């Protein structure tokens, strides 16, 4: 009997996956326990941040009896929960944003070139995996890594590029961005500058 063709089954197991390379960062690992009839069952919980360092980032939490399995589960979950964040010049945020989750509150500010990543712990991992090179941030609420990451991602979801803002308002990008002139224009001519003696 001839073998039947696999038509649409297996969800492309034989097909090579064309996924971009992701970097991951282990943020926290905790020992957890579950009380069962015979006593306590111990395991590990891992918190992992994953990103392509070009504007996509996600995080995941995994639990297992062994550390490597917990990290693997967390990494897989993080890859399924990726969000895309528009970056200004591929290095910083377009505008200042705030984020919160539970008791976690964070403030993130755009920064000039050469500033570096001014952020602590879990927030730094998110920015590094996202590909941000210049940012100033502060966490004012809960220092729990889970809440800090969720608050950071909440703020990053509200990040918009000038193009996105212009399309929402039905305007051109030039109308949204401020003019870079030193002096205001009056009917096409530069306004006189008053000199005080």
Swiss-Prot record:
Gene3D superfamilies per record: 3.30.160.20, 3.30.230.10
Entries under Pfam families matching the protein: Ribosomal_S5, Ribosomal_S5_C
Keywords for this protein: Ribonucleoprotein, Ribosomal protein, RNA-binding, rRNA-binding
Biased composition (Basic and acidic residues): 1-17, 172-186
One Gene Ontology term of the molecular function aspect: structural constituent of ribosome
Matching SUPFAM superfamilies: dsRNA-binding domain-like, Ribosomal protein S5 domain 2-like
Protein known as: Small ribosomal subunit protein uS5
Protein encoded by which gene: rpsE
